[in-house]
Amino acid sequence: MIGKRLQLARTAAGMSLRDLEAKLDKMVSAQALSKYERDEMMPGSDVLAALARALGVPESYLLGQNDLTLESVEFRKNLITSRKEEASIKASVLSEVERYLEIEDFVGVGSASWSRPQGSPYRVEELADAELAAGRLRSAWNLGSDSIPDLTEFLEERGIKVIPLKLGERISGLMCLAHRSKGADVPIVIVNQEDTGERQRFTLAHELAHHVLQAPEGARGEKLAHRFASAFLMPAETLWREVGKHRESISLGELLELKILFKTSIQAIAYRLKDLEIIDAPTMKRLYEEFVRRGWRKPPYAEPGAIPPEKPERFRRLCYRAVSEGAISESKCAELLGLSVRELNRRLENPA
């Protein structure tokens, strides 16, 4: 039966039953669509094909049997305007995760296993605790104090699925767990694919905090996760080495060089310098006023030296492997990657 998946795909597309009826040119009524979703009726092959086209999903998706559910869904910013918007985002997340797990099954590799780092979850009540927790995690993962070149790849190697989605300018990201009846839960971080690379990296570190910290809920917990992310991406020892332990002033040019080093925003670096008391409150105030004057404090946050978004490469590598080994057809590979078969062949034979 297709009920659950049909409802999920419709919700992900942001359509009501009446909207879908109109999209199908009234090929079937909203009442019939409702019965499909309640598994009281099964559409014929022609209607199934039309539903797939209207919803932008393959027929195989509607006919699939995976029983994934999302748990512990937490949006980084409490700015969802409606239940419809929230349901649409959750449906899109489930669809993306399902594709990921499907290709892992085809290749037979299984998910990279997430295991909690040594000593976690780290209990944090104060900002100093968040600083210590970031250092403990870096130590548990043998990261030293250097900048992490590709945080997305690093987290995927440790079993966290990273999925970019269009979330609109109000939402930076979210975290959740995908629960399946067979197999371990899969931790997931969703980042806004329209954000710059430096903003995505901070979101990843912020959402990682929710996976590894035991912290208060609400605004206090968000503040602690924010400090953890800052300390995890920009260790104090490295900043002290680069800029010293106390500065009367710092130029935008120097902040830009630090942005290139840490792959975080100029503004995040400035706040980190303030947190570590490398610069004082009046210096931070002057910098903040300059950020406002230059328009960096509001979308599109157009700082110089934008960092390219990191791309989750593991999913694509698995798709290429599966088609090369004959585990899936070219059409299935193209479907999973959202490409035409022609474009897939071009990428396989003539990569740029």
PLM regions: where:
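Short juxta-domain linker segments that transition from a proline/glycine-rich
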Residues: 1-352
